[in-house]
Design a protein with these regions (language model features):
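C-terminal cap of metal-dependent C-N hydrolases
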Residues: 26, 385-440
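Active-site gating loops and adjacent loop-to-helix segments of metal-dependent hydrolytic enzymes
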Residues: 89-119, 167, 172-182, 240-271, ...
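N-terminal metal-binding scaffold of metallo-dependent hydrolase/deaminase domains
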Residues: 1-61, 72
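His/Asp/Glu-enriched, well-ordered alpha-helical/loop segment
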Residues: 264-268, 312-400
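Metal-coordinating catalytic core of metallo-dependent amide/deamination hydrolases
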Residues: 147-277
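Divalent metal-coordination and catalytic microenvironments
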Residues: 40, 45, 71, 82, ...
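Alpha-helical scaffold segments that flank or form the walls of functional sites
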Residues: 41, 92-161, 185-198
Length: 442
């Protein structure tokens, strides 16, 4: 008996289709493709084509399932380059700056993840919040506990989400119940890499929290993990807060700078992502650019914790790769739209400007390019994975009023970026399948 075909019937999604086909930092408005009264055709979870609805034939229509999102906007799924799933219970916690905030709120919250049931429950809530906000790809911090990684990878795998995470490595300057050793951190991380990395849409991220919480021996083991395992990420923090920078200088008196510590241990490169990058000097910034290391811009966190202002335009001018990030729970929203709003304001405060298209690019193709997943996601090129978000221009009264008065697609985009939040997400699709639907969520 012949095997039953697993090929799914194609699906046509009707809406205005928006995506970047280039980098607006380089090519300006030419980087954006807009198809009014358009369609997105998905076959077996991949993008087959996009185009004008009027170009479809009767046979095209009759051979496909059809989903009517007319009046809304289909855009590529958002990419979040830095956030902490164990900190969802302390998001919006009052009154401290970075180091004090970690000690008072973050570390106690992370200690709860020694309980696998708690980790599983938190992972489920976390993934649902990402999808509710239109985020389809994310680089995430877990805790020191292996089960925190297992829980998040399991949930992401179940919904077919493109996600990278890793066990936090800390062997000093942290509570005893969150401390590993250089050896155990290495062994646990390698076991998790062997178990999860490259399985489906999952990738592993080697995760030393930041230099102050790792001994030099642990940083040596971190380098071995990062450089001996093909395709893994390295994620950490650098130069977020002035007091932190001073502390690091005391802990590593031999180093030229905070970034120099990571460089010394071979922890820079095209798959290394560092949160914040606010207090870096010219030598550091040149090294970031030359090595291809990625800076994760976390505006809501930087403002909430009073850390400082990242220079996005300056980073781009230096050809430093950047990815926008929520940094939940120091960050105050899962929404990449809210994050873009704050990124715009931070850039304004620095005396620069960032265009609506540049911000949209950072959320989609730009973030994917920074994380080296632009061959898989980021826009609607044929053959890419069909991760997309349906944005509702009538989600709120003020957004609807502003969009109705827009004179260009750039104004529509900017309205979403400045006025939008999770209410704008009508639906989120992973590999073509609806993973979140606003109607079902109520």
């Amino acid at each position: 008996m012949p095997e039953k075909s697993t090929r799914q019937k194609p699906t046509l999604y009707f809406a205005t289709v928006l995506h970047c086909i280039g980098d607006p930092w380089i090519s300006g408005a030419a980087a954006l493709q807009v198809i009014d009264d358009g369609y997105l055709k998905v076959v077996n979870g991949l993008v087959d084509s996009i185009g004008a609805e009027s170009d479809l034939t009767h046979d095209d229509l009759s051979s496909c399932n059809q989903v009517d999102y007319r009046g809304n906007y289909i855009v590529p799924g958002f990419v979040d380059g830095h956030l902490h799933y164990p900190q969802i219970g302390v998001i919006g916690s009052y009154g401290e700056q970075l180091i004090e905030w970690l000690q008072k709120y973050a570390f106690p919250a992370e200690a709860k993840f020694s309980d696998p049931a708690h980790a599983t429950s938190a992972a489920d809530f976390f993934i649902q919040q990402l999808l509710r906000n239109g985020t389809t790809s994310a680089l995430v911090y877990a805790t020191v506990h292996k089960q925190s990684v297992d829980a998040l990878f399991s949930k992401a795998s179940a919904v077919k989400m493109r996600l990278a995470t890793g066990k936090v490595m800390m062997d000093r300057n942290c509570p005893e119940n969150l401390r590993d050793t250089a050896e155990s951190g290495y062994e646990d991380s390698q076991a998790l890499i062997d178990k999860w990395h490259g399985k489906g849409r999952l990738s592993y991220a080697v995760t030393p929290r930041f230099a102050p919480t790792s001994t030099e021996e642990q940083l040596e083991f971190t380098s071995k993990l990062f450089n001996d395992n093909d395709g893994v990420y390295l994620q950490s923090h650098v130069a977020e807060n002035k007091a932190e920078v001073e502390w690091v200088a005391d802990l590593f008196p031999w180093s030229r700078s905070y970034l120099d510590i990571y460089d010394h241990y071979g922890l820079l490169g095209e798959r290394a992502v560092y949160g914040h990058c606010i207090y870096l000097d010219d030598t550091d910034l040149t090294r970031m650019s030359d090595s291809g290391t990625i800076a994760a811009f976390c505006p809501t966190s930087n403002l909430f914790l009073g850390s400082g202002l990242f220079d996005l335009v300056g980073a781009r001018d230096r050809n430093i790769k950047t990815v926008l990030a929520t940094d939940v729970g120091g960050g105050t929203s899962f929404s990449m739209l809210r994050t873009a709003d704050e990124a715009y304001k931070v850039t304004q405060l620095a005396g620069n400007t960032v265009t609506p298209l540049q911000l949209f690019y950072e959320l989609t193709l730009g973030g994917a390019t920074a994380l080296s997943i632009n061959r898989q996601v980021g826009n609607f090129v044929t053959g890419k994975e069909a991760d997309f978000v349906v944005l509702d221009p009538n989600a709120t009264e003020i957004l609807s009023y502003r969009v109705d008065n827009a004179q260009s697609i750039e104004e529509v985009l900017f309205a979403f970026l400045i006025l939008g939040d999770d209410r704008c997400t009508l639906a989120t699709h992973l590999m073509g399948e609806a993973a979140y639907n606003r109607t079902d969520a109520h």
